[in-house]
C-alpha cells in the first residue's frame, strides 16, 4: 500500500524552520563552502587555479601553525589518563607543576572528568575563576554568579536565549560585528539594532551613536534589551579607552540596557 503521508511533511529545505534558513553566519558561509570544495579538489588531484587554500575566515591560530599551550595539554593528558601518574618515570616526562596541578584536579573530580559536572561547571574551578577575577580587577567576584561554557559561542547563545522573548526585543550590535550575534538573533526571533563604530576615530564607540540607535529602535516599537560591546573589537581589533567604557556603562544604566561584554 502506498504511503499516504503527504510529501509536504517530509523534512526538506522548504519546510524546515525559516529562522534557520534566514540565519547567515558569514564566517562559515558560502565562500567558505566553496573554498572547502576547492581544497578537496586540490587533494584529489583535480585541476584548479590554485595549489593551496589558506582559511582566514575565523580566528584559528593552530590551523596555521601556532603551537598549543604546553601546560594545559600536559595537565589534560594526566587528568584524562591518571594511570600515567603511577609510572616511575613520570618526573622525567612531566614538569613538577603539571603533576601537582593534575593531582589537585583529580582529587576534586572524585568520579573523573568523564562524569557529568554541575551545570555551571566544577565548583573548585568556579572558585579559581572568581579568585582570578578578584586579583585582576580588585573587585570581589561571587563564584555562584559564574558559568563556564564550552567556548564563547555556547555562552552567547545561552544568554541571548534568556533575554529574547519575541521580535519586539532588540539587541544593539556593533557594525562591523562578529556575525554569530546576528545569526543567533535570527534563530531566536529577536531584532538586530545596528550601531556603527567610528572608523575615523580608530573604530571608537560614540555615545551619540548609541543614543540615536536606541531612539530609532524605540520609535519602531522595538525594546532595546541589551547591547553587545566587543572589546577588543572583532574584526576591527580596537581597544576601548577606560573613559569610553565608563560612558557606555552610565548610558546603559540610565537606559536599563543589559551589557554583554565580549572580551575574548
Listing of model-derived features with the role each one plays in the protein:
Residues 2-120, 131:
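N-terminal "arm"/small-domain region of PLP-dependent enzymes with the aminotransferase-like
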Residues 80-254, 260:
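Conserved core of the PLP fold type I
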Residues 263:
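Walker B catalytic acidic pair
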Amino acid at each position: 500500500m502506498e504511503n499516504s503521508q503527504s510529501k509536504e511533511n517530509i523534512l526538506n529545505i522548504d519546510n524546515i524552520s525559516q529562522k534557520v534558513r534566514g540565519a547567515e553566519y558569514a564566517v562559515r558561509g558560502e565562500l567558505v563552502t566553496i573554498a572547502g570544495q576547492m581544497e578537496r579538489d586540490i587533494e584529489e588531484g583535480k585541476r584548479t587555479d590554485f595549489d593551496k587554500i589558506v582559511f582566514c575566515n575565523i580566528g584559528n591560530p593552530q590551523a596555521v601553525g601556532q603551537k598549543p599551550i604546553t601546560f594545559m595539554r600536559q595537565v589534560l593528558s594526566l587528568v584524562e589518563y591518571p594511570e600515567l601518574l603511577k609510572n616511575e618515570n613520570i618526573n622525567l616526562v612531566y614538569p613538577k607543576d603539571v603533576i601537582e596541578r593534575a593531582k589537585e584536579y583529580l582529587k576534586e573530580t572524585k568520579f573523573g572528568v568523564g562524569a557529568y559536572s554541575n551545570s555551571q561547571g566544577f565548583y573548585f574551578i568556579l572558585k579559581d575563576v572568581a579568585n582570578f577575577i578578584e586579583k585582576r580587577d580588585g573587585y570581589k567576584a561571587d563564584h555562584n554568579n559564574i558559568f563556564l561554557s564550552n567556548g564563547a559561542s555556547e555562552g552567547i547563545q545561552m544568554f541571548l536565549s534568556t533575554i529574547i522573548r519575541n521580535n519586539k526585543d532588540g539587541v544593539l550590535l556593533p557594525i562591523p560585528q562578529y556575525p554569530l550575534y546576528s545569526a543567533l538573533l535570527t534563530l531566536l526571533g529577536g531584532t538586530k539594532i545596528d550601531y556603527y563604530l567610528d572608523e575615523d576615530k580608530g573604530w571608537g564607540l560614540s555615545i551619540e551613536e548609541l543614543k540615536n540607535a536606541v531612539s530609532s529602535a524605540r520609535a519602531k516599537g522595538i525594546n532595546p534589551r541589551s547591547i553587545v560591546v566587543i572589546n577588543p573589537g572583532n574584526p576591527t581589533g580596537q581597544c576601548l579607552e577606560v573613559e569610553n567604557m565608563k560612558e557606555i556603562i552610565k548610558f546603559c544604566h540610565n537606559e536599563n540596557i543589559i551589557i554583554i561584554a565580549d572580551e575574548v
